[in-house]
Structures are given as structure tokens and as C-alpha cells.
């Protein structure tokens, strides 16, 4: 039972029946006023709560207590089950019982005291002032794992079959004691992802009609539900974002929260709700451009770039310098912001030229020069922190490259980040056997060349050593995540088999723990992470 501020709810005596005849005098004390000591009650579905009430005429007796709505009707959803005497005369508890129909309701009712005059047969009703009684029944597909539950209902229960076409829907979040929920709100939803879209458990992109705070994160319309289908630990992305958040030279790291997803009444399993990578004051905080920003300082930013070998950005090109694991030389760049419809030819020419000039200088003879070398074009500190996250987490996608982001603000240098998509092969000797004894991303994209500069290498080593005490706390964080996700994992892996990821990897499982139990997979993840902290400093 939830009580709001105590209020005195006074009532008036109502004569329910009068004969109009002269009646015998009855000196029995009567109830003239009653007050209830709560203005709002929540009743869990199928359960009961106690409502304290006080009869001011302490010597009075009464025969019945009921609940009445406006017009004198008794509600079908709930009733008074019994009356319990209090410690003092005139003080009682009305036990109010939910009818167990499994429906939501929110009613204004009054507590009615019924008195009957034995000598005349007249009935008198005294009512309290109105108070609120409500119940929130669990929606279809309800699941209880200790995590917040995200309910998405598409219009007409329409399936989500496309990564391009949005489906209209409503979204509601049932929170926990620690995390506030979200009332039903309109949205659109579509699929997302590259390889991950083709697995049975789908990832989704949500676009709310109105910006909303979710789990304390900044207001925004766009949110992502990562399926973590192939991740037996359910925490690779979660832990990676935690590590990235420790990097003070990365301007922004997406906030995230594990949730359960119920789609059109069906439980879909454990998901990670995460902020989408977008240009925004509270996300990638760079200058927003217009199609008129084509000359001078205005054309210099901001830009959000993605390096991705899938080559599925609308605006993309390959710069010939640098190394990728897919075909050798050259790095694929794509423009994520400005949007393709808003990007002008002058802006594209500028950012392609900036990347080309940066790479030419980096691979030129004078690249170590602190004023006119690569440091003139790159935010070096961000590139160091970015590399450390990928290397500590054993993520080889930096070298592919896949889901690698950079951004450039107006008048600023090219900056690494944010981190994104850390589920494929993260902390796995299966995908990166070299991690047992060495580095994974020693030559990824531009890092092979950067590490040829002793000043860069010294700075990288010093930064790693500075961060090491923080990085050593991550195994404890993994333990916290394991406790948080245990019940979710039980339900999730009863529905989904991560080993099916082999269908997208030549018949071989990707992370190496897909056939393990949840707890064994977490222990393996933690062990490999600890190994990384031992191996990396020996190679710097």
C-alpha cells in the first residue's frame, strides 16, 4: 500500500431511507463522521491492502462497510474483505481485496459505513471523502528477472521485418526499485545491424515521437536495443562501455542498461538498451551543420565518420593509407553526419580532403614533427584512449575496421570515438589467438604508423600505466554484472542458442564460449581480461 500525505477526509451523514412517519426515539450512538487516513492506495493484482479509518463517534456500532463509487455503485474491481479492530476504540482497518481480474484500474471511491436502526428498519450511510485506489496489472508477456522490462507493441501487432522501414508502435518501461520506468509513449521501430540482423534474435532501433529520459540518461528520441545474441555472458557490450567510460580523453561513451524485451506480448529475452551514436549536445557534442556551411571556418565541422568494412554507408570512400584486416591497405570511411540528404558537395570535399591530408602527413617523412606532423591533425590523447579500450577488451574490430568512429568539430582536430559494438570476438582467444601473448591491434588502421613514433609509444605506455588501477577494478564489475544478469540469462538461453552464430562464421562459433554455461562463460571472460592486463604492458 502506498500512502500519500495523511489527510482528514470528512463525511456527511446521509439518510438512505425515510418513512415520513414519527419514529420511536433510538438512543443508540450513531456514526456521524468517518475519516480514512490515506488519500491513495495501490493494490497489487490479486492481493489485498489495509486501509486505516477512524470513526469519530467511538461508542457507535455499525453493521457493514463497503466501497462506493459516484452514484452509489459498488466497484466490480475490488471490495472490503473484512474489518479489523484497531488498538484504540473507534480505530479500524478495512482490508480491501483486489478481485483478481488481471486488469488495470484507477478509481475514486468512498468508504461507506452502514448503520441499521433495529427498531425502525431505517438504514443510514455515512461516507468518507473520496480517495484513489489503483492497480497496475502485469501486461501480457510479463517477466520478472530483476531487470527493467521494455514493452513494445506495434500497431496491429505488425512484425518488424526491415532495417529500412519503420513500424509505428508504443513503448512502455516497467522499472525497478532503483530505476524509474516510463509511461506508454508513441514511437517507431525498425531492425538494425549488419550480421546481427540475420540471427534469430533481432536487434532494434527505436525512434520516440518525443524526447524522453530513460534510466537517468539524457533526453533523446533515438535508442537501440542490442540483442547480444551470440554473447553467452550477456555482458561484453556492458563491460566495454564501462571500460570506455573510464577514459577521460573520450568525449562521450553511450550509456546503457540491461533490460528484458517484450514485443507484442511475447518475451524476446535479455537485451541491452543503449544510447544510439548521434550528433547531439549530450551525445557526440560537435557543431551541428547546415547546408549553408560551405566555406571558411563553417565548413570545417562538425563531422561524424564511421570506418566500416561492410561499406554500407550512403556516403563512403576508401583512403589508400593505413591497414585493414579485410583486404590489406586502405581504410573505408563513411559520413554519418551530416545526413546524406543534408551533406553538400563542398562539405564532402572538405572532409575527404582533411582525411587525405592527415594520412599523407602521417605516412610522410616528417610525420613525427610535433607541430607539422600528425599531431597537427589528430587529437592524440583520444586516439590513445580509444586504442586502449579496444586492446584491453581484445576487440579486433579496430583492425577490420568495423563500427569504428571518429569525429571532427568545427575548427578542431580529428578525434577518436565513441566506442560502439563490442560483442563479436571480444575477449576471445578463438577470434584473436595472438592475444595470449601479444597485442591485437598493433597495426590497426593508422596505429602501426603512429607507434613508429617513440613519443607516441611513450605516451601510450604512460597512459596505460596511469589507467591500470582503474582497469583492475573491472573483474569486480563483471561479478556485479553476473549477479545482475543471472535470472535473465536463465530465461534468455532457454529461448536462444548462441552457438547458432556459427552459421555466419563458416561453421565455427565466434566467441568460443557459446556452448558453455552462463557462469562458466563469465569466468572465462574474466580470466582473459585479467590476462590482457598482464600481457599488454610487456608489449609497449
Question: How would you label these PLM feature ranges?
Answer:
Residues 55-59:
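Extracellular acidic, Ser/Thr/Pro-rich low-complexity tracts
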Residues 91-102:
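Extracellular/luminal low-complexity segments enriched in Ser/Thr/Pro
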Residues 41-47:
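Short, solvent-exposed loop/linker segments at the N-terminal edge
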Residues 158, 195, 199, 333-400, ...:
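Middle-to-C-terminal accessory/interaction subdomains
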Residues 135-239:
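Conserved NTP-binding catalytic cores of kinases and kinase-like/nucleotidyltransferase enzymes
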Residues 8, 13-38, 122-140:
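Bacterial Sec-dependent N-terminal signal peptides
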Residues 207-213, 227-229, 249-254, 266-388:
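Internal "kinase-insert"/substrate-recognition segments embedded within catalytic cores
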Residues 68-91:
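Low-complexity "stalk/linker" and mucin-like segments enriched in Ser/Thr/Pro/Ala/Gly
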